[in-house]
């Protein structure tokens, strides 16, 4: 037996509360930020998180397409970055402990809780990839100005565009901070050694914690660039203000001399 797991970043966020109220299936587990369904009649599984990721278990292409169209009704802003990850759960009753590999995990038995843990880790991986893309774009967009500063000793960016850039950086950072819980271990692993072991090994396999640390480091680089750009812009604005004051003083002197 094999379960194919597919995770897709569909939107920046979902309205989970509204979705749960209107989706005609009973949840296996969930909270205000996530919901997991074990659809036993069709041997399918579904996991939806409020930060825009959906994970399918044993869904064919038609069923996936229909659900994606449906879930978009609960999305704030859709994402078109082709962020997708596939993983497999294989059953082998002859083993006693889970065996985690790069693209599949082998388990001694299959139950909804095990599938949920696998789905959760894939969700975390895709969500991290989304934020990696966003921070990569921020670093790339700031690189142009850093090169310009190195070669010309000045920045051509306007105050308005800098403020837009600052807003974009803060928006990404706030989104990451709001969704820090994606790294939290689910409650059901606390009292279940088998699930805890599976969760820990999957986190290692997907490099969840190292990737988050790298993400935090890259955000720090962006923030340092912001500080530099702001300082340069403040100096430029200060110099411009000084020239305005000097010109006004000169005009005042000329007018005074003319009147006398």
Residue ranges and their predicted role:
Residues 102-103, 147-148, 193-194:
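Short, flexible segments with low predicted structural confidence
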Residues 19, 66-67, 127, 131-134, ...:
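Hydrophobic side chains in well-ordered alpha-helices
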Residues 152-254, 259:
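Membrane-associated alpha-helical segments
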Residues 113-178:
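Membrane-proximal low-complexity regions enriched in glycine and acidic/polar residues
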Residues 22, 70, 134, 141, ...:
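Residues that form generic nucleotide/phosphate-binding pockets
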Residues 27-34, 89-101, 125-141, 163, ...:
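Phosphate-binding glycine-rich loops and adjacent basic patches that engage nucleotide phosphates
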Residues 1-111, 117:
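Short Lys/Arg-enriched alpha/beta "domain-start" segment
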């Amino acid at each position: 037996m094999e379960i194919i797991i597919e995770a897709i970043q569909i939107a920046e966020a979902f309205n989970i509360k509204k979705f749960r109220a209107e989706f005609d299936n009973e949840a296996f587990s969930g909270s205000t930020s996530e919901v997991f369904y074990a659809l036993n009649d069709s041997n399918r599984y579904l996991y939806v998180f409020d930060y825009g990721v959906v994970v399918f278990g044993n869904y064919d292409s038609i069923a996936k397409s229909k659900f994606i169209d449906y879930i978009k009704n609960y999305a704030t802003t859709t994402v078109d970055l082709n962020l997708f990850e596939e993983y497999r759960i294989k059953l082998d009753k002859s083993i006693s402990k889970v065996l985690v590999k790069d693209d599949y995990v082998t388990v001694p038995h299959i139950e909804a809780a095990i599938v949920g843990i696998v789905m959760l880790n894939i969700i975390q991986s895709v969500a991290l990839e989304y934020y990696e893309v966003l921070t990569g774009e921020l670093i790339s967009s700031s690189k142009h100005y850093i090169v310009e500063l190195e070669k010309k000793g000045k920045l051509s960016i306007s105050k308005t565009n800098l403020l837009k850039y600052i807003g974009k950086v803060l928006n990404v950072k706030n989104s990451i901070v709001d969704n820090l819980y994606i790294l939290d271990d689910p409650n059901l692993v606390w009292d279940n050694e088998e699930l805890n072991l599976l969760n820990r090994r999957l986190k290692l396999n997907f490099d969840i914690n190292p990737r988050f640390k790298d993400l935090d480091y890259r955000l720090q680089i962006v923030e340092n660039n912001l500080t530099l750009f702001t300082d340069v812009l403040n100096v430029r604005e200060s110099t411009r203000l000084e020239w305005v004051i000097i010109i006004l003083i000169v005009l005042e002197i000329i007018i005074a001399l003319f009147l006398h």
